[in-house]
Amino acid sequence: SPDSNAKTVNCESYDGTSWSEENNVITGVSWMTGFGTQTAAMIVGGTTGSGVLVNNSQTWNGTSWTEGNNLLVATEGNQGAGTVTAGLSGGGLAPSALLTSQTYDGTSWTEVNDLNSAHGYAGCFGIQTSAVMCGSSTPGRQSTTETYDGTSWTETTNFATARYGRSES
């Protein structure tokens, strides 16, 4: 019987009208984060199934995937923002919710100031020096919202209603 924990390696791109099959990712994972553009993107972290967390990073150049340097902490449900030369990964689960934040300079990951609240499977958008992280599903729904200025996280006005679930831009 098929492995219910098997992860797909398929990759597709969208041109504004239709989807096209692209070269496969190197390692199939789920619950990872991603950031970048259609021709320069990165996926980091995630799980290969059966509770196995990874710290892999894979970079897309518009044609193919290459293995990048690993995150400092294996995690799933982390949030990301930025570009392949100025990326940000924060929060996630390993296995409990994390405060950890890391930045990427195109070559390596560096630990930076922690989040004020642990966020797993939250929403995140922006760039490495100006990002917003909000909500969470772990532990429970949260209304917390934080902004990142390239140095530290600051709690800002909370959502009126606690939220959970992922969103990336």
What are these regions (language model features)?
Residues 1-169:
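Polar, enzyme-active/binding microenvironments
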